[in-house]
Amino acid sequence: MKFIINLLLSTIKIITFTVIVCLTILSIFQPIYILKENEISITTRLGKIQRTENLAGLKYKIPLIENVQIFPKIILRWDGEPQRIPTGGEEKQLIWIDTTARWKIADINKFYTTIKTMSRAYVRIDAAIEPAVRGVIAKYPLLEIIRSSNDPIQRLSNGILTPQETKINGIYKITKGRKIIEKEIIRIANNNTKDIGIEIVDVLIRKVTYDPSLIESVNNRMISERQQIAEEQRSIGLAEKTEILGSIEKEKLKILSEAKATAAKIKAEGDREAAKIYSNAYGKNIEFYKFWQALESYKAVLKDKRKIFSTDMDFFQYLHKRN
């Protein structure tokens, strides 16, 4: 019995030791690793790429022989340092451009072969985007950079151009605008990164700031531009006012003409009705009709009481009868 107990204890010790050794090997050499949804891994053997993994789950490697490096599979953010750049065109104004970008690893094999680490990736992105920004910005006038349409900038606040758009037609007509310029920067930057497995997804001009030496002159120029636009709007308003007043006068004359025509028509109808009534009255009592007509004539003739007439006239036969 004692022999059996000792044998069992020895077996338990051996099993325990084996488990501890296995766990130690697993913790040191890590032949198993977990790949997350937003990650991609590359496995190398003696510096050569063996395989890549982009599906989440448990993954395996050969300890001491294979190495695994994990990289993000998501779109990443890049923030550049503000750059002092002269604009294109005739103005050649110095401005500060602050840009941000989004990028991703498009080809893990190229990325690992040429760069290998994320820190070096950001260095290469700096070298790809910043020259592209300088080159593109230097080709265009300031208004092309800060506008995305022909609507003018409404205000300048603390030296920062705010792309707040209005409905007033500006004097300068842009041909491309900020959005197209950003796309041009993306295209050039991608040409610079296509050999290293990086894709520049988007580049945004986050802020455009005038150089301090130019703020006063730019303020004066923008005031002058606003005054020109205001004068243009006043001219448009006066033209519209003249047109509206002309329409009102035309409508008034039309209404008056129609009213006069209607009044003449009504008067004619009234005259006809009066003539009809007079005719009926004349037919019924001729003497009374003559008397009534005489009274109406007296009203018209004798308005001025200072007139002197002879009563011997037949006209006054109803006022004075001879004996």
Swiss-Prot record:
One of its GO terms (cellular component) is membrane. The keyword Membrane applies. It is found in: Membrane. Its main location: membrane. InterPro entries: Band_7, Band_7/SPFH_dom_sf, HflC. It is a single-pass membrane protein. CDD domains: SPFH_HflC (cd03405). Keywords: Membrane, Transmembrane, Transmembrane helix. SMART domains: PHB (SM00244). The chain crosses the membrane at residues 14-34. HflC and HflK may interact to form a multimeric complex. Belongs to the band 7/mec-2 family. HflC subfamily. HflC and HflK could regulate a protease. This is Protein HflC.
